[in-house]
């Protein structure tokens, strides 16, 4: 049986020492799929930690399919957690008052691959792998339920039949649903000065699509358009550098760090 943990150590430029476990995800599981996680520090000093749903069918946890744990508030699986810097539940997590585990900040997630904060608006964005199709870009809010597996644009890997409905009352729709799947990865919100027309846009790396997706947003965070930047290699992460340029890290035998510039 396996699980995910949050650990802390000190990196001296060559190695990590003093490793200690700060937090362990509840509900051990079998299999080697869908652990998580992405980490994101917030301005208040708390940490967001994404945890995946536990795995694809036929994997089960108890008498339920593993993926159904994303709708179970008594487990951390399929959720984003908000923790203090010592691994404790952060105060004010809204679902605790409804009986959820106190660390849970949002739920109904399948397998988050990118997590980023817009430094201007403060909005939190996440990219998420769907099953067969139905990858998502979500605007994540505290207390939100993002539907998996009841609400999804994806299909079952084996049967290719829909897993859930496209819309379910009380659950939050994705800002973007990608069908077919680009297999999104790392995520960044651009606020630099090198390409002013891109300010405020979300950039998502693509593993299967071998590209970067730019999602343009208006001031309210609504999607106004999309562009595709062909890279020709699996893109594992996208980040804005301190110099204001956008960088992409490829996931290949001979991986590269690429700087994106305007033509």
How should these model regions be labeled?
Residues 1-40:
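Asp-box/WD-like beta-propeller blade repeats and closely related beta-sheet repeat scaffolds
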Residues 3-5, 52-225, 255-256, 262-263:
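Beta-propeller domain segments
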Residues 237-263:
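Blade-level signature of beta-propeller repeat domains, shared across WD40, Kelch, NHL, RCC1
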Residues 35-38, 113-115, 185, 236:
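Beta-propeller and closely related beta-sheet repeat lectin domains
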Residues 24, 31, 107, 179, ...:
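WD40 beta-propeller blade-start loop/N-cap
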Residues 35-54, 78-79:
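Aromatic- and glycine-enriched pocket-lining scaffold segments that form the walls
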Residues 44-45, 122, 199-200, 243-244:
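Short coil/turn segments that connect the beta-strands within blades of beta-propeller domains
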Residues 109, 221-242:
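Conserved blade-ending motifs and adjacent loop-strand segments that build the rim/top face
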């Amino acid at each position: 049986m396996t699980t995910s943990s949050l650990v802390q150590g000190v990196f001296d430029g060559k190695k990590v020492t003093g490793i200690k476990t700060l937090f362990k995800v509840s509900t051990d599981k079998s299999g080697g799929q869908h652990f998580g996680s992405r980490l994101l520090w917030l301005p208040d000093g708390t940490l967001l930690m994404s945890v995946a749903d536990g795995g694809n069918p036929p994997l089960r946890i108890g008498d339920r399919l593993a993926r159904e744990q994303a709708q179970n508030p008594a487990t951390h699986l399929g959720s984003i957690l908000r923790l203090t810097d010592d691994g404790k539940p952060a105060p004010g997590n809204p679902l605790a008052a409804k009986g959820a585990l106190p660390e849970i900040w949002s739920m109904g997630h399948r397998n988050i691959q990118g997590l980023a904060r817009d430094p201007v608006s403060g909005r939190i964005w996440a990219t998420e792998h769907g099953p067969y199709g139905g990858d998502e870009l979500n605007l994540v809010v505290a207390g939100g339920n993002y539907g998996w597996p009841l609400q999804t644009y994806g299909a079952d890997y084996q049967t290719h039949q829909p897993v859930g409905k496209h819309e379910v009352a009380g659950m939050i729709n994705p800002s973007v649903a990608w069908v077919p799947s680009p297999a999104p990865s790392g995520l960044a919100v651009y606020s630099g000065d090198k390409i002013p027309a891109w300010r405020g846009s979300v950039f998502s790396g693509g593993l299967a699509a071998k590209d970067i997706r730019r999602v343009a947003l208006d001031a309210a965070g609504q999607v106004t358009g999309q562009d595709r930047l062909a890279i020709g290699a699996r893109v594992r992460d996208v980040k804005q550098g301190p110099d204001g340029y956008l960088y992409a890290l490829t996931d290949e035998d001979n991986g590269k760090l690429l700087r994106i510039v305007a033509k």
